[in-house]
């Protein structure tokens, strides 16, 4: 099977073939064309149009940057450069055919002029079966063994997946690139995209007021002077603003991506152009993922003394490969529930040898990023990937933490019928009081249209659940890790995988039933769409302050354990974002502060308070 997209000139010839067997009167009655116009559109006697397009089977594919599956599915790919060929004829300007097959315009005074020709364009591609066991890396490339560490974004050999930037199949690891300063200490998809990425970063800066405020306040002092931060997070425009803020505060940074699909290539290029050693691109393989992390850590003459992690992969890699580095590392800042869980496991086993800050459970992360960010981005991710209408659809959301609450609220507001699964009786009661029906997954799995996981756990959706799903059920994950959906169980010979668009796979059973799997079970919003910049400003500011706190803390303040961000800093982060809304805080009087037993400047709530 092949798909062709043709230009207006080629499309204009379609009605000629259909009209050749009609009399002028029949054509006039059926298409509303004048008899003169029909006669003018008829093919010349003695043969077909010499410029008529060849049969589909004979047309060669046209190479170039617009070809390929991504281009064929892009709205721009089918854009018609001129007015429709089926437009009703103008009484003053009629189309005629030259004897050589070209078009002509007849003006009212009888003058005949040749119409401008459009170049015929074809975009053609053949159906290809996805090979999930094939890696794009060259034969002989060293493999960073899976046994060394299990990634929280384990790709399950997804390197063969198509990505949005697949026009250049050469791996960035095989390219020799330098920025304008002559540095090659980076690895990105294409350094030439830096200018476009810079514009995206500048747009993000407008929605990240707290980080910009930190830059201004740090002009006279550098609280991170001497800090060498190695980071592993999603590389987006918002992350770039954070990295450049850390640089303005005096830190040196090296960065890799925590998710193989969430990197914005143009932003990574802009950071590399600015002198940041960045090792990331969209669509990394499993080997690429660990290679990028290793390039950030294993550097001659440079050793990190701070870690900023999202998912725990960077921390785990250093523990496994370079444990001696922890002698100089002052602390770890972890953003996600998956990474925090791994830190608590290390602490429980007595293997956590530095202080760690749990940003995920800070108020400003839980109550804003997890709730409001997911409430908006879940709809965006589903709409971009599936074009689905939400009204009346039955959806089950696994987990009713802050992420689950945001997803449920958004879908309910769009008219969906929402079910919730939950293990915690407190969260379960909250779901019931919010108007959602609490169920077990196997009770509704046959009837729901969408399954969304947001638990931070593993194997929440098993092969048994997947087998029982209805045809065309959409399955996706809003948690950090790709372990919530048992995707590995779907990579069996009896099931067929078809990539239908970027980050969208149809998994087809032998009886013809199919499910729609989004982002191969990885984080939906950052893999398939984007997230609100303003909310990420809150999280990024929390991360920056956590790094400052751990780096400057006197010896002995923090032991080898996992800590929450001090309440005073949570309140400070929130206060930096209030001016955006022209919000004005009420101040306590001395009498009121004394009555409540509070400092007038905060903190205003005890650590045990639940917002």
From Swiss-Prot:
Subcellular location per the Swiss-Prot or TrEMBL entry: Cytoplasm; Microsome
Record SUPFAM superfamilies: Formate/glycerate dehydrogenase catalytic domain-like, NAD(P)-binding Rossmann-fold domains
GO BP of this protein: one-carbon metabolic process; S-adenosylmethionine cycle
Region (LISN domain, inhibits interaction with ITPR1) residue spans: 2-109
Biased composition (Basic residues): 135-144
Family matches, as InterPro entries: Adenosylhomocyst_ase-like_sf, Adenosylhomocysteinase-like, Ado_hCys_hydrolase_NAD-bd, NAD(P)-bd_dom_sf, S-Ado-L-homoCys_hydrolase_CS
Residues with the Phosphoserine modification: 107, 149, 152, 155, 158
Binding locations of NAD(+): 336-338, 370, 401-406, 422, 457, 478-479, 525
Similarity-based family: Belongs to the adenosylhomocysteinase family.
Protein name from the UniProt record: Adenosylhomocysteinase 3
Organism: Homo sapiens (Human)
Lineage, highest ranks first: Eukaryota, Metazoa, Chordata, Craniata, Vertebrata
Gene transcribed to yield this protein: AHCYL2
